[in-house]
């Protein structure tokens, strides 16, 4: 009992230290936690999540090549046009566009490019930017749990398919439930006071001359290579979805399966990157300097540290976890969503949270190919690994706060009372609630 107390203390200390350090520090602190748990507290090291890391590396490599060719800028340009064309619907369009960009790219960092546009359009419509900004940021986080090319979705589909839930079926649950949750949250937020000219902080900044008029962005002509790189990437994503469905046991168009799902995604994405470099005539040596590549490799280190730390602790206490979880979650299914929500707050990654906890939950609930009665609980609760918005230290949250010159998107005096908490909790709660309705019908 005393040993377990110290082990939990080390686990929590490592997670809080990582959150405090931020960036690569999240992964570094995870490695420190593994070192202490194994060398000083007698635990056996868990499994290093090589599969998730390799998928992130491959997808990020392809997106980075597309960014270098101008394809990512072209994609954002399309999104900007949609937002500017329908400014009055900014509260619905901002999360919709952010969601779609994340679904396609497999990373929520694409929302960075939308933040200045959202602020400008909101200002022009006398709407507090904090509403569409918070909705967009949160939507980009929950969309990770529905993106065909995100590491979290690929991991989940890989571990759930042997249990009878194929890739396409899972997407049929996760995409509509998460998107509808984003739209319902936007509708609910519409009942709050959204008038910008009623915000005293904004009026104070306006009077002090701290708010500059929106800058007109110079329209740049999109090159043919930029458009081509985007279409190559989209083609790769579609090919992955079709191939992953074709090799599933329920469809079985491809038999025998020579290239498994994880290997297929890595090889497809690297092939996409190769085609972009060849046909879009970009310098492959410069790809590593792109912002997407740097943030993606940072994500790899974070997943390495925190997922390894989580698996080290969980794998050494699997019997106790099975004993308590088997009856608690079976009797109170929503507790899994709560546990995943709390874990992702600290692990700071949808993929790392899934990798650290889901295998143990499957074992604890006794789910197998012959016993799938509790499978819907895991599928329905998956969206709750998106609680990266709770601590206001995530890059997209900080970016939204920094770029909102109206001052309506605030950090909060007591850490948790920031602009993203209520929309985030609503989106995740509604996603899970809808999941519990849809998952039993589809599976």
UniProtKB/Swiss-Prot annotation:
Q: Name one GO cellular component term.
A: plasma membrane
Functional summary from the UniProt entry: Responsible for the transport of C4-dicarboxylates.
Q: Give the location in the cell.
A: Cell inner membrane
Location, primary (coarse class):
membrane
Q: Name one Pfam family in it.
A: DcuA_DcuB
Q: Where are the transmembrane segments?
A: 21-41, 46-66, 99-119, 142-162, 171-191, 228-248, 264-284, 295-315, 327-347, 375-395, 419-439
Protein's name in the database: C4-dicarboxylate transporter DcuA
What PANTHER family would the database entry show? ANAEROBIC C4-DICARBOXYLATE TRANSPORTER DCUB, C4-DICARBOXYLATE TRANSPORTER DCUA
Alphabetized InterPro entries for the sequence: Anaer_Dcu_memb_transpt
Q: Which species? A: Helicobacter pylori (strain ATCC 700392 / 26695)
Single GO term (MF): C4-dicarboxylate transmembrane transporter activity
Annotated family? Belongs to the DcuA/DcuB transporter (TC 2.A.13.1) family.
Task: Tell me the membrane topology, using the record's own terms.
Answer: Multi-pass membrane protein
């Amino acid at each position: 009992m005393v040993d377990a107390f110290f082990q939990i203390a080390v686990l929590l200390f490592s997670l809080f230290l990582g959150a405090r350090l931020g960036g690569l520090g999240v992964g570094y602190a995870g490695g420190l936690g593994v070192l202490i748990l194994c060398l000083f507290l007698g635990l056996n090291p868990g499994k290093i999540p090589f599969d998730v890391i390799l998928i992130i590396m491959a997808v990020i490599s392809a997106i980075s090549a597309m960014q270098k060719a101008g394809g990512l800028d072209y994609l954002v340009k399309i999104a900007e046009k949609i937002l500017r064309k329908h400014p009055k619907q900014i509260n619905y369009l901002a999360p919709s566009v952010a969601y779609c960009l994340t679904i396609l790219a497999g990373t929520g960092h694409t929302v960075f490019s939308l933040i200045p546009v959202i602020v400008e359009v909101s200002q022009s419509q006398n709407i507090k930017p904090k509403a569409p900004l918070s909705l967009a940021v949160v939507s980009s986080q929950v969309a990770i749990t529905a993106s065909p090319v995100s590491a979290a979705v690929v991991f989940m589909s890989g571990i759930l398919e042997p249990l009878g839930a194929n890739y396409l079926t899972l997407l049929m649950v996760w995409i509509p439930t998460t998107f509808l949750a984003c739209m319902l949250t936007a509708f609910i937020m519409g009942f709050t006071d959204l008038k910008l000219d009623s915000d005293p902080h904004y009026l104070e900044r306006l009077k002090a001359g701290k708010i500059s008029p929106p800058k007109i962005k110079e329209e740049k002509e999109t090159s043919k290579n930029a458009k081509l790189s985007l279409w190559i990437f989209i083609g790769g994503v579609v090919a992955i979805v079709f191939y992953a469905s074709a090799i599933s046991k329920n469809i079985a168009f491809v038999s025998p399966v020579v290239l498994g799902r994880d290997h297929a995604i890595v090889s497809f994405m690297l092939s996409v990157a190769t085609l972009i470099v060849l046909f879009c005539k970009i310098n492959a040596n410069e790809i590593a300097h792109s912002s997407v590549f740097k943030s993606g490799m940072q994500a790899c280190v974070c997943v390495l540290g925190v997922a390894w730390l989580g698996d080290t602790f969980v794998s050494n206490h699997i019997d106790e976890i099975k004993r308590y979880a088997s009856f608690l979650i079976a009797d109170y299914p929503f507790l899994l969503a709560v546990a995943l929500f709390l874990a992702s707050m600290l692990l700071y990654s949808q993929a790392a949270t899934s990798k650290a906890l889901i295998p143990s939950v499957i074992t604890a609930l006794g789910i197998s190919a012959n016993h799938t009665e509790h499978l819907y609980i895991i599928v329905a609760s998956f969206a709750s690994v998106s609680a990266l918005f709770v601590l206001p230290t995530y890059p997209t949250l900080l970016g939204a706060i920094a770029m909102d010159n109206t001052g309506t998107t605030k950090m909060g005096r007591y850490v948790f009372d920031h602009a993203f908490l209520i929309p985030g909790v609503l989106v995740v709660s509604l996603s899970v609630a809808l999941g519990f309705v849809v998952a039993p019908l589809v599976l």
